Amino acid sequence: MKPLVIKFAWPLPLLLLLLLPPKLQGNYWDFGEYELNPEVRDFIREYESTGPTKPPTVKRIIEMITIGDQPFNDYDYCNTELRTKQIHYKGRCYPEHYIAGVPYGELVKACDGEEVQCKNGVKSCRRSMNLIEGVRCVLETGQQMTNCTYKTILMIGYPVVSCQWDEETKIFIPDHIYNMSLPK
């Protein structure tokens, strides 16, 4: 009687295919990613991610909603500020963005203001009791961050802000300006 392996040689390669592949002995690390500046690395990760973005830090919130070094009266204010501050959502232009012309400490007082409905009707916002100068940036053309063109509109009004709890300072802080309601 002859053994089966010699009589039928083709099952041997099939049996070898059924063996489990060897397990890798280490974790995969992309060392090139860790050579980048941490802020650049976080920006790339957020830009390429498919899930929700991480909440901005207090420093980033202050940068996004308060005036920069450039004067308000510049006709191209929104285009330059929104590009230099990199204000976008995963590379896409915001249709509208407000920037307050007061220090952030003054804007924090808006979280103690009157509760009003936000523009989108979903959230509960707070309206400041103090008139402030601000800029409304309205998207004119473009969809991607590199080709956004904004119209700059100077305003004086009551900022309508959404507020979030800050664990460090233990107070509510404004995180987004939804509107600037005009005085009556």
Curated annotation (Swiss-Prot):
Signal is among the record's keywords: yes
Superkingdom, natural source: Eukaryota
Record-level GO BP terms: positive regulation of flagellated sperm motility involved in capacitation
Residues bearing carbohydrate: N147, N179
Subcellular location: Secreted
One Pfam family cited in the UniProt record for this chain: RnaseA
GO molecular function annotation: nucleic acid binding
Signal peptide: 1-25
UniProt-listed InterPro entries: RNaseA, RNaseA-like_dom_sf, RNaseA_domain
Matching CDD domains: RNase_A (cd00163)
Keyword hit for Electron transport: no
Disulfide-linked positions: C93-C148, C111-C163, C118-C125
Keywords: Disulfide bond, Glycoprotein, Secreted, Signal
Gene Ontology CC terms, in alphabetical order: extracellular region
Its biological purpose: Does not exhibit any ribonuclease activity.
Family: Belongs to the pancreatic ribonuclease family.
Protein name: Inactive ribonuclease-like protein 9
Gene name of this polypeptide: Rnase9
